[in-house]
Every structure is written in structure tokens, then in C-alpha cells.
Amino acid sequence: MLTHLDSQGRANMVDVTEKAVTEREATAEARVRMLPQTLQMIVEGEHPKGDVFAVARIAGIQAAKKTSDLIPLCHPLMLTSVKVELSAEGTDAVRIVARCKLAGQTGVEMEALTAASVAALTIYDMCKAVDKGMVIEQVRLLEKLGGKSGHYKVDA
């Protein structure tokens, strides 16, 4: 059942008024593949635009807070925690893991996915002058806790 459609098939924001406030958490990831020398520049702090990981982390946090401005039917949420972690993966990729939490009436999956996506886009933006062939991939939900639909964890 598509929850964002009314009985006439029109898009609407889901009414969560009667839903109980519960603790909710979601974790998402994204990867940015790049040339090994691009990753080396980032890791060694030699990028001319500054600390790529720090800027991407802040962008991801800000994006999570702005999700309802970007995704039309998302509820504006009072997030209680947003964490964005970036790490080198092998010799040619950055892995981004975003985790969002709140006590509320609706989940935070879109906020976690948005945080990971925008952090990846920020890496691309900062590094495109040296590596136009970067690929953003594997944007996905890793885990969701809380709410009526219960626990979800991606298969390893």
C-alpha cells in the first residue's frame, strides 16, 4: 500500500497525528569512487579547497535537517542526533555512513539517506576539478529501528 496517496490517488502528506511518539533511528550509506590519487589527496589533507571530510560531514548534517524542504511529502522533524562518518575504503573510495535519531511519530530513513547523499555530492563538488570521473554509488538504507514497521537491517 502506498501511504502517500489518498483514496483518489492524489499525493498527500501522511497524517501522523494519532501515531505514538517512539524512539526512531536510521542509518544509511553512500560511496564515492575516485582515482587513487584523489583519495590520497583527501586523506593527506592536501586538497586545495581544504578538509574535504569536514566539509562533507557538515553538509550531510545540514542536509538531514533540511530533508523536508527537499522531499515534498516528508514531515519536518525535530532530529535529536545526526552523525555523519566518512572513511577511506581501499585505495579508491570514500564510504559515508549517516545516522539520524529522534523521538517522534514518523521515521528518519529519508533524513539519513539525504545526509549520506549530500555528503557524497559535496565530495564530488569539492573534487571535480581534479577527478571528473568520480562515481556516487550504493546509496542505501542500512538499518532502521523503531516505529510500527519494526526493525530492518540490510543483509550483509
UniProtKB/Swiss-Prot annotation:
Family annotation (Pfam families): MoaC
One of the GO BP terms on file: Mo-molybdopterin cofactor biosynthetic process
Xref: InterPro entries: MoaC, MoaC_bact/euk, MoaC_sf, MoCo_biosynth_MoaA/MoaC, Mopterin_CF_biosynth-C_dom
Main enzyme class: lyase
Catalytic activity: (8S)-3',8-cyclo-7,8-dihydroguanosine 5'-triphosphate = cyclic pyranopterin phosphate + diphosphate
List of residues binding substrate: 73-75, 110-111
Active site: 125
Keyword terms: Lyase, Molybdenum cofactor biosynthesis
Pathway: Cofactor biosynthesis; molybdopterin biosynthesis
Enzyme Commission number(s) of this protein: 4.6.1.17
Single GO MF annotation: cyclic pyranopterin monophosphate synthase activity
UniProt family annotation: Belongs to the MoaC family.
Function: Catalyzes the conversion of (8S)-3',8-cyclo-7,8-dihydroguanosine 5'-triphosphate to cyclic pyranopterin monophosphate (cPMP).
Assembly and binders: Homohexamer; trimer of dimers.
Protein name: Cyclic pyranopterin monophosphate synthase
Source organism (scientific name): Pseudomonas putida (strain W619)
